């Protein structure tokens, strides 16, 4: 994990140390190295966490002719193969780091290079001779990148709060984004909760040149059904998982696996343990209460693969209240995910033992593992029954007593039956509607602009989704902004 930031054109007199103060606000992302590039036309800063090539690869990295500069957060898994291809085209390399491969690739293929990179990245590339800045983000938005346009100038950084360091960036709430938060429990990209600050969408590049800003999508997911058997599909999935984990095991620093005991992280551990030449470290958190604690499962998995296992009991005397403000600070934007708390303490436990940790995040989206995804499939069958029958079933379900469980069976049944009366995408958002909670009502009451963005209106995400034709095979993968809490830790 690294941090990048910058803005074209040197600041006004008196702002000369701003890029250094922005980099200082990102220091937790890159504790190993800090560097800057400044010219009469741009200020760039980078903080680096060294994972590959610990001796070279400091950033910003400048091309041999001094014209092109790169700041980069991420990892390019196929950089070795691309290095050979670029060497055959006449490029020479001074380091073994993937940053230099990305720089050479951009000089060779311009923005077409991004489709050649397999990995996770947020990158800024500056051409001094052309006065041209290009920002780009990986296919799924694993690495974050925020930007703001003020007049003729562009400002960007790996974290939203880093932009606040610059005196030109105001802190005004975007009420439409606030409505999105109460509807979805997070703010989907490209919006942020701050008016005028945007997330660069996944799979996009953005160009600033001659005071003009343009953006273009360079990758888009495409559903291409294949006529293969279940056995063939499983073999292909296993091979792709094996390759993906193998590429993530490449590291010049200690590496471990976050293990929850579920299928996701256990699968990652399997492919890591069967390909690693050293004993792996695993890290887990446990809870009181059978409903949440997966301790028996992750201990069994860790024992089976013989890992060097580390476990943290969250019921110990941990300063949860004291850590809360720091956790929120790292999240940049509000997200109604209580999992941020155990992830924070898990990261704190991991850091003394490993610099890099693999996790099973994203598998539920890939494998339709959430209950709402199954509800979509069941609802499709339910819609084949008469509407009158569905309404009678809903009436009967409302007679069931309310349970004291967090999400009881009767709640799920009522939401499911009422959702079966709605169009498919609108029903998906209906399963658990946060905007109906008391927390959202005062905001809607005090700000008519927010009230008008209800799902029945035209501005809220649910309303937009209900009008968008569904793509075959897609559930609701939240790929508007893929970076997660642990990525910012």
Set out the residue ranges of the language-model regions.
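Glycine-rich active-site loop/lid subdomains used to bind and stabilize high-energy intermediates
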Residues: 46, 151, 210, 300-489
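Cysteine-centered catalytic environments shared across enzyme families
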Residues: 1-331, 343, 347
């Amino acid at each position: 994990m690294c941090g990048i930031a910058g803005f074209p054109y040197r600041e006004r007199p008196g702002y000369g140390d701003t890029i250094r103060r922005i980099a200082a606000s990102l220091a937790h992302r890159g504790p190993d190295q800090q560097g800057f590039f400044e010219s009469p036309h741009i200020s760039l800063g980078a903080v680096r966490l060294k994972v590959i090539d610990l001796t070279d690869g400091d950033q910003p990295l400048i091309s041999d002719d001094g014209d092109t500069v790169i700041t980069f957060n991420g990892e390019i898994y196929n950089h070795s193969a691309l290095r050979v291809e670029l060497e055959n085209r006449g490029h020479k390399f001074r380091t073994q780091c993937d940053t230099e491969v990305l720089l050479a690739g951009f000089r060779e293929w311009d923005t077409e290079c991004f489709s050649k990179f397999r990995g996770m990245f947020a990158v800024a590339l500056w051409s001094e001779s052309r006065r041209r800045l290009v920002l780009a983000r990986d296919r799924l938005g694993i690495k974050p990148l925020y930007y703001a346009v003020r007049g003729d100038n562009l400002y960007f950084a790996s974290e939203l709060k880093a932009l606040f360091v610059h005196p030109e960036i105001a802190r005004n709430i975007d009420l439409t984004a606030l409505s999105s938060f109460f509807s979805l429990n997070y703010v989907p990209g490209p919006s942020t909760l701050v008016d005028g600050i945007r997330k660069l969408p996944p799979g996009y590049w953005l160009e600033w040149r001659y005071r003009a800003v343009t953006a273009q999508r360079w990758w888009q997911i495409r559903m291409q059904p294949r006529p293969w058997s279940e056995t063939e599909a499983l073999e292909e999935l296993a091979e792709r998982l094996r390759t993906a984990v193998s590429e993530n095991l490449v590291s010049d620093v200690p590496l471990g696996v976050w293990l929850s005991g579920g299928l996701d992280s256990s699968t990652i551990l399997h492919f890591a343990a069967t390909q690693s030449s050293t004993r792996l470290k695993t890290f887990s958190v446990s809870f009181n209460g059978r409903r949440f604690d997966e301790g028996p499962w992750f201990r069994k998995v860790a024992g089976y693969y013989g890992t060097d296992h580390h476990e943290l009991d969250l019921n110990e005397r941990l300063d949860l209240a004291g850590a809360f403000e720091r956790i929120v600070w790292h999240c940049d934007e509000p997200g109604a995910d209580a999992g941020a708390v155990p992830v924070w303490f898990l990261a704190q436990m991991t850091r003394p033992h490993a610099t890099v940790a693999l996790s099973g995040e994203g598998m539920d989206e890939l494998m339709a593992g959430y209950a709402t995804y199954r509800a979509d499939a069941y609802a499709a069958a339910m819609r084949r029954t008469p509407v009158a029958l569905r309404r009678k079933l809903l009436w009967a379900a409302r007679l069931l007593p309310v349970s004291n469980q967090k999400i009881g069976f009767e709640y799920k049944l009522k939401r499911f039956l009422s959702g079966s009366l709605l169009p498919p995408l609108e029903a998906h958002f209906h399963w658990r509607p946060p905007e109906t909670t008391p927390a959202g009502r005062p905001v809607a009451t005090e700000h008519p602009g927010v009230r008008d963005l209800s799902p029945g209106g035209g501005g809220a995400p649910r309303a937009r989704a209900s009008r968008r034709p569904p793509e075959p095979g897609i559930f609701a993968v939240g790929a508007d902004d893929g970076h997660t809490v642990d990525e910012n830790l």
